[in-house]
Swiss-Prot record:
The lineage of its organism: Bacteria, Pseudomonadati, Myxococcota, Polyangia, Polyangiales. Transmembrane segments: none annotated. Keywords: Iron, Lyase, Manganese. This is Mannonate dehydratase. It comes from Sorangium cellulosum (strain So ce56). GO terms for biological process: D-glucuronate catabolic process. Catalyzes the dehydration of D-mannonate. Its cofactor is Fe(2+); Mn(2+). Pathway: Carbohydrate metabolism; pentose and glucuronate interconversion.
Amino acid sequence: MKMTFRWYGENDPVKLEYIRQIPGIYGIVSAIYDVPVGEVWPVERLQALRARVEGVGLRFEVVESVPVHEDIKLGKPARERLIDNFCQNIRNCAAAGVKVICYNFMPVFDWTRTEMARELPDGSLTLAFDAAAVAEIDPEQGISLPGWDSSYRPEQLRAVLDEYKNVSEEALWEHLEHFLRRIIPVAEEVGVRMAMHPDDPPRPIFGLPRIVKNRDDLMRLVKTVDSPANGITLCSGSLGADLCNNIVSLVREFGGMGRIPFGHLRNVAVQEDGTFFESAHLSCEGSLDMAAIVKAYHDVGFDGYVRPDHGRMIWGETGKPGYGLYDRALGLVYLNGLWEATCKLSPGPAAKVPAPG
């Protein structure tokens, strides 16, 4: 298990040199964030990013994310040129030493929250999702959501939502299949594993189709193009926001198939109606048994990449919601502790945290 940490580049309030000081850190997960969606990332930019990361003694082997243009999801004629560009991005990432590319196929909205700074009883601030509040939102009036690279202007949002009114879940699956049949052969050719991130939260929102929500969706995904290069970013927090999703079972099934090149390990406190907030990583803080999840990774012989996911804002830290240093660092060290204990107390090879650099 290679423990990584997301970094948003030189504009990130969290310094790369600080991340390097986290015990057990292997590498950085990052991307080129200032190139418009659908355009090609210059290979020189990727190589420079790799050199910057390696300069502090870490690895850069996972990209998160290469955004998928809406015209691809909508199946519009422009998709062929955009898929060509996406394929070139896969090649360019491979040329810079990238092994895994995370991406998603969520229409319009990326990960969706109603609060960016919910105060918990201990005084920490966290991301939260109120199912009832979302049901009352009219997205056509214009909203800004965390996790976007940019937000739509109200008129742009209305236009793209109108386009999706005629796109059913099955039609979105057809568009995804077309996309996968184009990109997976390229990934195979250059030795990159694609890792689809599930929908977050794992349910339809604002009347938009969502197709990567549960076990059946994940199985359809990996069988659509049956290749080791067609994998999953198994995000415990995203899938875990639906109490029907058994994360331990998902890790055992898809990890046993060798289809989890990348995992997000975080906890989430979920209510029956789908309302949730993002808790500390510790099992007792949320709805997920993180120790059992880590053991499942161990039992399937997982040797891929994981990272702690969204953290709370603690100890007065400010910055990008969900992506501060302190709580994610605590999460990483906790996860490494679970991994070491699991390896030493379970049959199999002794625990080993991969060395950086």
